Structure formats: C-alpha cells, structure tokens
Amino acid sequence: MTASLLMLVVLMTSFAADKWITNAQLSLPLLIAAVCATATAAVGIPLLRRLKMGQFIREEGPKTHQSKAGTPTMGGLLVVPVGVVLGSLITRDAVASQQLLSLAVLTLAFMLIGGIDDWSSLTKHTNTGLTARGKLLLQAMATAAFLAIAAWQGWISSSIALPFGLELPLGLMIWPLGLFVVLAESNATNLTDGLDGLASGCGALVFTGLALQLMLRGDNGDPALAGFCMAMAGAWLGFLVHNRNPARAFMGDTGSLAMGAALSGVALLSNSLWPLLVMGGVFVAESLSVIIQVWVFKATKGPDGQGRRVFRMAPLHHHFELGGTDEQSVVPAFWLVTAGLVLLGLVLRP
C-alpha cells in the first residue's frame, strides 16, 4: 500500500460513508483539513529548516537511519492545530461544542508537552529531551484536568461498551483507567513514530475507523466527534504528503503525543475504548514490544550487564528492519495491518 493509495482509500471511504450512512458528513472535514495541512506543512517545513530544527538520530539505532539526521522535526506543530481547529468547528450543539473544546485543549496540551520535549532535545543536541518522569507527570496533569471536566459534566460512561451488546461495568475504576489509556495511547503513538510515514498513515486510518464506528452506532451516530476524527485524519494525510519516504519532516513528540491524546480522548468521550484497542492494534504492538524487550532484558541480565533480547531491536518496526526488510516495505505492511484491524473493529463494534 503506497501513500497515494492510502490517501485514496481514506477519501473514497469518507465519500461512501456520506452516501450510505445516515447523518454522516465525513468527507468535507477530511478534505478541508487535508488541503490546509498540506499547505501549512509546505510553508512551515522550510521555516523549521531555517530555524535549524534538525532531528538528532541515536547512534544505537539502525545504521540506515543515520542519513535522516538533520531532517526538520516538530512537524506536528504545523498540522495538529489545523485538525483541532477545524474539528472543533464541526457542530453548533452546545454540549457537543463543549466536548470538542475539551478535546481540543487536551490535544493541544499534549502537543505543547511534546514540543517542550522536542525543543529540549534540540537544545541539548541529543535524541533525549525531558526526563521520562517529568514528561509523564506533565501528561498526567493534562489528562487529570480533562477527566475532571468530563466527570463534572457527566460525559464519560462508567462501563465499557463491548461487541454483541455486552458491557463491562467499572464504576469509579473508569477514572484511573481513563488516565492510563491516555498516557498509554499517547506514548504508544510516540513509539510508533520511528519510520517515514508510519505513525501519520496509521493514525489517519485509525481516526477514520473511529469516525465510521461512531456514525454506525445508535440512531444518528455522533457526527460531532466523528467530524473531529475526520479533521484529524485529514491533518495527518496532509502531513503524510511531506512525511512519506524520504521524509521532508518528522512530526516529533509534538505530533505523536497529540495524536495519541486525541485518539484516547475521543474514545473516552464516546465509549469507544474497545474499538480503539482493536483498530489501534499496531500502536499496542509497538508499545508491548518495548515493554517485553525491557522486562526480559532486566530479568535475564547477568553479572556482565547483558541480558536476553526477544526482538532484534524495539519498537517492533526496528525488529523487522534489522531482519532485512527495508523501511519502504515495513511501513506499507503496517498500514495494511492497521487497515485490516480497522475493518475488524468495525465488524466487532459495540
């Protein structure tokens, strides 16, 4: 699956949804956001280059990535606001507008946290920015504020909707779970952003999948949150024009953290945690590969400080790279898997 084919699939899917799903208006926010994001990135990337926002590549990473050094990062700054602003203007309904505003603030807060992390990395001339603990604390504070507003307004269900009419009642446990979901999803999308076009393509597909299942649930669906999803999908497709191999810019933590926050925020507000888990399976796999790699290495570490490794390198996409599969093959394969998981999530929607 090439980038052009992925874009065509998402576009045609939105047109088909508008035609066949009652109350669906998915293609307009997708198209407007895609065009605007393509333009803002085209204008902004040369500016990032002039400001010397070049990415540093870690030496222990795949050797083929060393040629990417100096590619402008913080590209999320150019497209996330496009998706957020356009997505927030979808509806005139008062309650839906308040939800979209809170979702926009959460997304932009994570973009800011990612931006601080990226900037810290650039000023230190390394591939590491904020400390893991410091970044996690900032993310937790932003998420807690979002959840507090949602709790006050009664926006989040205390049970998780599952397929076949089933529900998993959680009561007050939904709140710590909500915190975990936002932190886990944002860091999972961050880990996925390691190859040209990988996270932006997968993100566009998952946003589209969430929008479709939102419109297929209930009598009239949820056009406000579905429209927000399509605006975000369009923003990432617009960025993909510049981020596909060879990438002219990277989204950085600025974009990847915001992507995960937006996905999880939509899922929490719409009781779509199950669809997000299924459709975002690539994000889950990338994150689990890192957790497994670290845990096994520490558990088997000997006196020499060396331990066993389950994967050649984590996250998972590097495992395939070091196995001899080139980047231009790994990325489309992951897109294809994500597309399959989106279809599965639609079949198994609550």
Swiss-Prot record:
Keywords: Cell cycle, Cell division, Cell inner membrane, Cell membrane, Cell shape, Cell wall biogenesis/degradation, Magnesium, Membrane, Metal-binding, Peptidoglycan synthesis, Transferase, Transmembrane, Transmembrane helix
Topology within the bilayer: Multi-pass membrane protein
Protein name: Phospho-N-acetylmuramoyl-pentapeptide-transferase
Species annotation: Synechococcus sp. (strain CC9605)
Gene name of the record: mraY
Function: Catalyzes the initial step of the lipid cycle reactions in the biosynthesis of the cell wall peptidoglycan: transfers peptidoglycan precursor phospho-MurNAc-pentapeptide from UDP-MurNAc-pentapeptide onto the lipid carrier undecaprenyl phosphate, yielding undecaprenyl-pyrophosphoryl-MurNAc-pentapeptide, known as lipid I.
Subcellular location: Cell inner membrane
Cofactor(s) needed: Mg(2+)
CDD domains: GT_MraY
Pfam families in the cross-refs: Glycos_transf_4, MraY_sig1
Membrane-spanning parts: 28-48, 70-90, 100-120, 136-156, 164-184, 195-215, 221-241, 249-269, 328-348
GO molecular function, one term: metal ion binding
GO cellular component, one term: plasma membrane
EC number(s) reported in the record: 2.7.8.13
Enzyme class: transferase
Catalytic activity: UDP-N-acetyl-alpha-D-muramoyl-L-alanyl-gamma-D-glutamyl-meso-2,6-diaminopimeloyl-D-alanyl-D-alanine + di-trans,octa-cis-undecaprenyl phosphate = di-trans,octa-cis-undecaprenyl diphospho-N-acetyl-alpha-D-muramoyl-L-alanyl-D-glutamyl-meso-2,6-diaminopimeloyl-D-alanyl-D-alanine + UMP
InterPro entries: Glycosyl_transferase_4 (IPR000715), PNAcMuramoyl-5peptid_Trfase (IPR003524), PNAcMuramoyl-5peptid_Trfase_CS (IPR018480)
